[in-house]
Amino acid sequence: LTKGIVKRGVTELVTPGVATSDKLLENKTNNFLAVLHLSDPLCGIAFLDITTGEFYAAEGNVEYMDKLMQSFQPSEVILSKSQVKRFKEQFDTKVYTFQLDEWVFREQYAYDLLLQHFQTQSLKGYGVEDLRSAIVACGVAIHYLKDTEHANLQHINSLQRITATDFLWMDRFTIRNLELVHSSYEQGTNPVSYTHLRAHETRED
């Protein structure tokens, strides 16, 4: 028998946006965590898939944020506690949400976290240096992963800026009827993921 106090390691905390199940890997299905920073005049958003390491950032108005949410279909959205009411009023979604304290959304804190994570002196090489609200969202994403005890983040080694021309925009009705992201049937074939949609880009000569 062991005498004294037995120290036990802290395990990773699993929430919908940071789940890394084998089923997701087998189906090549993205599981995006989203961080939304509702600010004026421009909001910022980050999408991060801890399984694949994909990390995206964007900035724009609420309508643009809503369109991106429809396209990426995140399984969890991180918000500051003060923005929950506004989120419910402006976004028509039942996605799982988690709230963090206001101080986590400080711009300098988020910026420093990203510099530390990417081991760089600036974010110019990632094309997001001028996206102040998006930088906040990205920094909060890294904070959340660390806060939920996800220590192995070396595979998250790039950050891609999203522009409005990157997507073919469709409304919720079209997406639902075409079953582009989630099947309307609980049983049956696997849904077509955002990854699969991106793999078939239309090129213009």
Task: Kindly give the residue locations of the regions a language model identified.
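Charged catalytic and DNA/RNA-contacting regions of genome-maintenance
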Residues: 1-198, 203-205
